[in-house]
Amino acid sequence: MTGKELDIQRGKLPAARIAITVLAAGYLGVCLVPCPLARAGAERGDSVQQTSESWPAYGGQPSQDHYSSLTQINRENVQNLRVAWTFDTGEKGSIESTPVIVGRMLYTYTPSLKVVALDAATGKLIWTFDSGNHEPDASRGVSYWTDGKESRLFAGMRNLLYALDPATGKPIESFGEGGYIDLRKGLRGDYKLQSIGLTSPGAIYKDVIIVGGRNPETHPAPPGDIRAFDVRTGALRWRFKTIPEPGEPGYETWPKDAWKTAGAANNWAGMAVDEKRGIVYVPTGSAVFDFYGGDRAGDDLFADCELALDAETGKLLWYFQGVHHDLWDRDFPAPPSLVTVKRDGKRVDAVAQTTKQGWMFLFDRSNGKPLFPIEERQVPQSTVPGEATSPTQPVPLLPEPFTRQAVDEKTLTNRTPEAHAEALEKLRTFAGGGQFMPGVLNKPTLEFPGVGGGAEWGGSAVDPNTGVIYINANQVAYTTTLVKNDLSAGVGIRTYRGQCAVCHGADRKGAPPAYPSLVGLFDRMTGPQVAAIIHQGRGRMSSFPNLEGTKLNALLEYLRTGADAGASRDSASNVGPSVPAVADEDSEDPDAIAGADLYTARCSLCHGAKREGTPPSVPALLGVGQRLNASQVTDLIHHGKGAMPPFPAIEDPELSSLLRFLGVRTEVAGADSGDAASEDPYTITGYTRFDDAEGFPAVAPPWGTLNAIDLNTGKYLWKIPLGEYPELAAKGMKNTGTENYGGPIVTAGGLVIIAATDFDRKIRAFNSRTGELLWEGSLPFSGVATPATYMVDGKQFIVIATNGSRDQRSSQGGVYVAFSLP
């Protein structure tokens, strides 16, 4: 491949790209939008400042540096750490949350999306907030705001953002709609058919909370607007559109009418805030569909971008696009870290962004100028009809990649001769093997690093005193197979291929534990339960409230039998109780509906005459139609939950009337929602990890690493394997590294502390200067999260969430563990 130095070869760009980078100040792909940047620190103010003892924000502080100035736990005594307390949520499922600690209060999530406040010194439960939405989700933390007089805690519950009183956990009714706002509102189309959720907590700046969201990765998907809401009222303060409309910068990088239908280009990874400059740095992901872009020809700004936005107004200051016309799901996967580095004897405030490709980009915070050279390199072109691949992609020259960049015969596993031979045989059937190989029809395309990075959502840690960044990374390969979508097939299989096969595979077998098998699903669940998961989502799965009527029934039949029900067959009778036909909550006066009498007789004793409930023990039913759909509420009514008894005798027409009274909406059963969800010309057959016959990676170790890079020079200080498989270690194959999710923290005590490894149930502390392992502690389950550290009553603690959800070989739970010195 030939490279083009960004600062001298900009004139050789294709004309379409020149048009959008004409203001690039001599640097291709980094665009400056004229805007006054100078802001006095006193004018901006600091909405959240980390004291030496607290951890008041996701990532430690708004800069996302994962740094603590605490030194009580240090290199000399870290080996003496012991368990100080544990908090067992009593639940099983994924916890990826990093607690926020303010004073002696610790705020975090349980696997079922309850928010809890604990005594940070003892782990004692102080309060619980239960929204009534118990479907697991990848919620990685809460946001804390204070102006010194009042304070608020913000918690995402899938499509809702709640404002809670940090002292009591009760919703603040003056915020939004009685304590929450619905993030689906204000996007494109009918918000009740949209799906969005807060994977990462919002960023706080002054008196606004800035949010992105996780969007579906298939059509239809809402646009990935970045929005700021007033922390007191919930009112929208500003919006930045990542899919530009006519007249907006970047519009020319899409087809003419793409803004009407294109989706995602969203921020799910989190953000960093420079409070003195008043800038929020926003990494975005790819546009849908992830693996085929024939309907979005062009570079697709502002997908896969690092955005610098004025945090006061949302105005674009500069951007850098890391992947043009993404066909590989190469989202920027983590919030950037703010750091100050030395350049030519001067200190330069910088922003560091890690990538799934195993790269790190470093920019001047003020103007977006790259601090290390970046080349636009020619890349392979697609042979798929209708596709229009970008001719080049940007590649940083420094630092060198923190993962290997390709797989070949020399880099396959040598765990056993048989494993190597099997891996070699598979490799010869694949296309690709490295970066930016477009999908080839009907042939597995090998992607390395895989869809899980490189770097991932845990983010990086930066020591502000040295300018050294610490990054954990995955080094396993995945394959995807692009296939033509048979539009002559029936509704069930077309809907499955369009919405489900991306994760669960064409054969419904998935890639456990991340993507569970759907074979035999109806042996474990009822039809309404499956429909509820489809409509609300679960874990990393987005919700699909747009799937109703014929499409939903046909999909359920296909999931139940593996046979397609076809376009004309209504299979609701085969999958359990039918979904009652319910009018839109806005179309009728709830008090005029006959269901009011049934509610008074059966529900009001617990939930109150005005549906207000007594949270958290008895949830309010006000607005339940914005949290749950008809399938979910029907399932709760018929089967009960917790202290609520079942009411199986409530059936239509009384059931429909009750649901109307509660404001619960769905389409009429049998109606077609009319979207184009299954009409993409191509889809993929799922994510498949390149493994040997025994389930270990088919590439050579290390399979996971921890890396230290001096950002002043771009040079590595050290690189070590991170994690191991206990069963391999028992046979003498140690320090292989494993897949790891969650990030590190770094302290003034000279330590890098990280759990993250999928299989060995360990948390470790390393010498930040040398990478030497100084301590490891055992956990009840794997700690797939980023730890936090803080001091209460003169004692420093390290706390980590554990759950085991990524290890199908072992049990799961939901336990927080805190360590301290004796």
Name what the model sees in each region:
Residues 1-16:
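N-terminal secretory signal peptides that target proteins for export/translocation
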Residues 197, 279, 494-567, 590, ...:
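Extracytoplasmic electron-transfer domains, predominantly the class I c-type cytochrome c fold
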